[in-house]
């Protein structure tokens, strides 16, 4: 049968101590199933959305268990207090201390092996890999930084820019800081953006400031306060924006994906 729908796969918190991803996934699911959200209901008429809320459940559990044990009942925003200083081994890796965001192509870990089976059953047109970076950085989204691998097509590169412009619209409306085309490249083949790209998808990394340092709230160098609520709101916004642009571009996504192969 001819596919007439766009397929979007959203992956959250492959580094388990980047908890805003997993937390925001719940809000994204709520937005999509809310019958009163008419815009989302329209998107779902021509778009299939797959959500992996915790790509690294070992690391996420390790981080959240530690945090619940040390966090104060009244959040302490000072960056040097214990709840902002995650100890070794931390939640970045899985149980075997392997970084799952280096394992997409090699599939040495059981989480990667099982995920890739499902990934190839669906073969999404868009894959977004939602991360966190150092707590005082503004939000990062596509287009990616150079270098691009030579096998990445002009279409894949150009559509990243379209998606980024859609995100920028919402960030500008809310006065949220962001940057593009810096730091996060598309060269190494085993990231959560490059492996999907080499399989015909438009693969992207999104990076929210926070990381394990963020906690429930943290004081920034500019004397502002970054809260978990803020971090979740930003990831939720780019997730929904990704689905929106996919829905508006279904025919092109399907055709370009077909042409790729």
Indicate where each model-derived feature is located.
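A broad, low-specificity signal for short, low-complexity segments enriched in glycine/proline
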Residues: 12-15, 86-91, 162-170
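Buried hydrophobic packing segments
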Residues: 25-32, 239-242
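Stable alpha-helical elements in mature extracytoplasmic
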Residues: 21-28, 40-43, 47, 96, ...
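C-terminal accessory segments enriched in acidic
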Residues: 101, 106-261
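Surface-exposed loop and adjacent secondary-structure segments within mature catalytic domains
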Residues: 1-5, 24-28, 41-107, 131-150, ...
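Hydrophobic, aliphatic-enriched repeat segments that assemble into extended interaction scaffolds
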Residues: 9, 33, 47, 53, ...
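Short HxH-centered metal-ligating active-site micro-motif
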Residues: 5-20
């Amino acid at each position: 049968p001819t596919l007439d729908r766009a397929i979007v796969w959203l992956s959250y918190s492959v580094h388990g101590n980047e908890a805003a991803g997993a937390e925001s996934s719940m809000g994204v699911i709520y937005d999509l199933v809310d019958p009163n959200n008419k815009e989302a209901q329209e998107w779902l008429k021509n778009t299939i959305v797959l959500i992996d809320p915790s790509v690294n459940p070992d690391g996420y559990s390790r981080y959240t268990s530690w945090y619940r044990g040390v966090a104060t009942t009244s959040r302490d925003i000072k960056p040097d207090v214990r709840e902002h200083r995650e100890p070794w081994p931390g939640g970045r890796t899985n149980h075997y201390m392997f970084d799952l965001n280096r394992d997409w192509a090699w599939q040495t870990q059981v989480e990667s092996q099982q995920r890739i089976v499902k990934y190839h059953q669906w073969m999404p047109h868009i894959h977004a890999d939602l991360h966190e970076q150092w707590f005082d950085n503004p939000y990062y989204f596509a287009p990616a930084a150079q270098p691009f691998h030579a096998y990445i097509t002009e279409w894949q590169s150009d559509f990243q820019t379209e998606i980024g412009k859609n995100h920028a619209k919402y960030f500008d409306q809310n006065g949220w800081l962001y940057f593009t085309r810096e730091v996060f490249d598309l060269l190494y083949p085993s990231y959560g953006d490059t492996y999907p790209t080499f399989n015909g998808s438009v693969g992207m990394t999104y990076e929210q400031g926070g990381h394990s340092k963020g906690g429930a709230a943290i004081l920034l160098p500019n004397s502002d306060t970054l809260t978990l609520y803020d971090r979740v709101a930003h990831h939720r916004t780019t997730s929904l924006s990704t689905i929106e642009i996919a829905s508006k571009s279904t025919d092109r996504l399907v055709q370009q994906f077909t042409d790729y192969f």
